[in-house]
Amino acid sequence: MGKECYYLSWILKFHLLLVLIQLVDSGSTIRFLPGFQGPLPFELETGYIGVGEAEKDQMFYYFIKSESNPEKDPLLLWLSGGPFCSSFTALIYENGPIAFKAEEYNGSIPSLVSTTYAWTKVASILYLDQPVGTGFSYSRNPLADIPSDTGVAKPVNEFLHKWLDKHPEFLSNPLYVAGNSYSGIVIPTIVQEISNGNHLDSKPQINLQGFVLGNPATDTDIDLNSRIPFAHGKALISDEHYESLKRSCQGNYISVNPRNTKCLKLLEDFKKCVSGISEEYILKPDCMWLYSCMANLHSLSEYWANEKSVRKALLVNEGTVRKWIRCNTEIAYNKDIRSSVPYHKYISIEGYRSLVFSGDHDMLVPFLGTQAWIRSLNYSIVDDWRPWMVQNQVAGYTRTYANKMTFATVKGGGHTSEYKPVETYIMIKRWLSGQPL
């Protein structure tokens, strides 16, 4: 009898341990966050999914369920750029249901407030910290290989399959892979990886419908070479300077022959001329010491995420990340994809929908370059250039191509949605529902 009780007790403990492990791996619901008054008015889940050999790489995510119809609304897998910028950047500054209150940091936990422009009003969003080393994602062993562009797709695809295995209620929801900035390089590779897996009958089958890219880095040469024409078009350099640059550099401002001293001198003059301009948003004032500045608002995330009470609330594994950094530029990374245009050509054939949008005051990845690589895909236009409106005002311009790609500018917008959050929310709401912009 004693042995039977012992074995029964052991079996119960073993099953309890399995349940606890599953709960930790599946993620847990967060009802309160430090800095926010009262319970959260939306459903937030955080957790880790192990990927790679022996699941040594633990990928951290924030999942916010759609506030409208989560059973049917699209599921967005969101990847922020950088590389190594936490997806919390998008959640808190660009398209999430909460944001930091614009006030001077006084040493206490920064305050959080609700937003009116959350994309989670029309979609469930899975914000992923990737690659490993980003945000709260970590590896149980020291990184054996330097992360790279070409190495992103496989672990993200593995993460998504495992997450959907644990959240089967979202398997039938339309899935879109979304992101901005540098994620424009890797998202097409991820879409291709997921698509190939579906063709190979990988389980679970993913209801992939397309992708969304905001101000996406795509082709190094095209993106960088478009900065000078953009600067001229925005009256940042003179006609004479621009014409001299075109003549001396012959349209190539990146890989300049060292013997072409005239071109190099003109490029130096260009850099000096725009040195006081923010590349991310050319209208952004130099206001480093004002609490409402973007730079100071961005610093609030690091104060907040490094609070012990915050990490406890988010269920971050203790001792895994010494210091949370919003964009961790200290980690080595191999940028081994110079152009993602070939991936776009491949996934265009598959017939996926896509939305590519550009803030028209972004000089980091100018809309001129984005238009250039889209033209290189050689698809006919099915809805030509026209304004799209918000409250009877022009919010930007748009056109749609035969490969189901919609391009849109955001008037007065910068490198990310945070500069025009209301307009980009209305844009994504219309596009996800299949309406014209």
Swiss-Prot record:
Its EC number is 3.4.16.-. InterPro entries: AB_hydrolase_fold (IPR029058), Peptidase_S10 (IPR001563). The active site is at 181, 362, 415. Disulfide bonds join 85-327, 249-263, 287-293. Glycans are attached at residues 106, 378. It is found in: Secreted. One of its GO terms (molecular function) is serine-type carboxypeptidase activity. One of its GO terms (cellular component) is extracellular region. Pfam families: Peptidase_S10 (PF00450). Keywords: Carboxypeptidase, Disulfide bond, Glycoprotein, Hydrolase, Protease, Secreted, Signal. Expressed in seedlings and siliques. It comes from Arabidopsis thaliana. This is Serine carboxypeptidase-like 17. Probable carboxypeptidase. It comes from the Eukaryota. One of its GO terms (biological process) is proteolysis. Residues 1-26 form the signal peptide. Belongs to the peptidase S10 family.
